[in-house]
């Protein structure tokens, strides 16, 4: 089935989703399964950057693929998922990406999956990726050479570029709950510091460095200290971002009000920054 026909099938099924359940068979089930397999293999992705385009509008979102992911929850019953600690199992609707894999499949995939990492089926992991004990949700895309460090989470349908480092405990938001229009996107060559959270469809531009403990949502003000320009939902390429505060409005009695959180672009990435945040090729062999 051609992709345009598959898209039309998924769109129609999503409009009629109230009628879809675990007993649904035929074209709808086959179409959703095909979409998930294409996502899992990286042949299709929920969002893709347009050639030559720049800025926050450079990404095209394939909403129909996100809808296919959502439909899969209605189509699939709960079942046991093997591989729990001590020989136990889990109870879920989404199998592991690694279910049924042998050494041959792991070698062909070309990425490292450290014990206790979790990747749900329909997430794509490119060759050269390193997955520490982390969680990658369904529909996500993690590109070549990236590292997902310990306890980091890549949310549903999130897009992680090439040579990205997601430090320990980083959270990259998903799109399924609460339902978001666009996925969170981390472009190529970015470094996201430990325990930072990037959510709600925010785009981090290529080569940017986000410091430890920075929280950016779709409503967070991102202020360029050099120019005073305020960005919402988008960090320009090669920015160095830290946590900051905006002065609050006075309270009714005239006393200073509480300050409000913001993110601050303190400078553009330079050689010194890169030396501290560069990819270690020894870990990618």
From Swiss-Prot:
Its EC number is 2.3.1.117. Pathway: Amino-acid biosynthesis; L-lysine biosynthesis via DAP pathway; LL-2,6-diaminopimelate from (S)-tetrahydrodipicolinate (succinylase route): step 1/3. One of its GO terms (biological process) is lysine biosynthetic process via diaminopimelate. One of its GO terms (cellular component) is cytoplasm. CDD domains: LbH_THP_succinylT. It catalyses: (S)-2,3,4,5-tetrahydrodipicolinate + succinyl-CoA + H2O = (S)-2-succinylamino-6-oxoheptanedioate + CoA. This is 2,3,4,5-tetrahydropyridine-2,6-dicarboxylate N-succinyltransferase.
């Amino acid at each position: 089935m051609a992709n345009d026909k598959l898209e039309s099938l998924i769109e129609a099924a999503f409009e009629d989703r109230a009628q879809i359940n675990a007993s649904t068979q035929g074209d709808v089930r086959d179409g959703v399964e095909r979409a998930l397999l294409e996502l899992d293999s990286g042949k299709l992705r929920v969002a893709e950057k347009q050639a030559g385009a720049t800025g926050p509008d450079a990404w095209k979102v394939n909403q129909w693929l996100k809808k296919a992911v959502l439909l899969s929850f209605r189509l699939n019953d709960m079942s046991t998922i093997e591989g729990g600690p001590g020989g136990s199992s889990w109870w879920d609707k989404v199998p592991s990406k690694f279910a049924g894999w042998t050494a041959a499949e792991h070698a062909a995939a070309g990425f490292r999956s450290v014990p206790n990492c979790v990747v749900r089926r329909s997430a794509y992991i490119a060759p050269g990726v390193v997955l520490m004990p982390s969680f990658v949700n369904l529909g996500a895309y993690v590109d070549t050479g990236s590292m997902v460090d310990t306890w980091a989470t890549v949310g549903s349908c999130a897009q992680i570029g090439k040579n990205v480092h997601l430090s320990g405990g980083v959270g990259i938001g998903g799109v399924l709950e609460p339902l978001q229009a666009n996925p969170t996107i981390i472009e190529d060559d970015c470094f996201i510091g430990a325990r930072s959270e990037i959510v709600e469809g925010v785009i981090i531009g290529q080569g940017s460095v986000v410091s430890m403990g920075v929280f950016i949502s779709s409503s967070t003000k991102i202020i360029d200290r050099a120019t005073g320009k305020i960005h919402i939902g988008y960090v320009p390429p090669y920015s160095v971002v830290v946590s900051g505060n905006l002065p609050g409005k006075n309270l009714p009695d005239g006393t200073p009000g509480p300050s409000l959180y913001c993110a601050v672009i303190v400078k553009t990435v330079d050689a010194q920054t890169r030396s501290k945040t560069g990819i270690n090729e020894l870990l990618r062999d």
